[in-house]
């Protein structure tokens, strides 16, 4: 269910601010979004997997916190990230 090493490296490369940047909010939100999208496919096949659903809700909440932080720091970066990831808000 987790992202492959290649998928994760590609996401980090696409969203990093500088070489070696893995901790910026953009990278973290992009990784969480990819994990969330992957888990949503899992729940279509396994609707009764409540244990994993708890993890999904935790990821969604963490993404929301990071987006709120980014919105408070720099609205233009927040808007660009929302548009790039296709999130509603």
Curated annotation (Swiss-Prot):
It comes from the Bacteria. GO terms for cellular component: cytosolic small ribosomal subunit. One of its GO terms (biological process) is translation. The keyword rRNA-binding applies. Keywords: Ribonucleoprotein, Ribosomal protein, RNA-binding, rRNA-binding. GO terms for molecular function: rRNA binding; structural constituent of ribosome. Pfam families: Ribosomal_S15. Belongs to the universal ribosomal protein uS15 family. Part of the 30S ribosomal subunit. Forms a bridge to the 50S subunit in the 70S ribosome, contacting the 23S rRNA. One of the primary rRNA binding proteins, it binds directly to 16S rRNA where it helps nucleate assembly of the platform of the 30S subunit by binding and bridging several RNA helices of the 16S rRNA. This is Small ribosomal subunit protein uS15. It comes from Pseudomonas fluorescens (strain Pf0-1). The gene is rpsO.
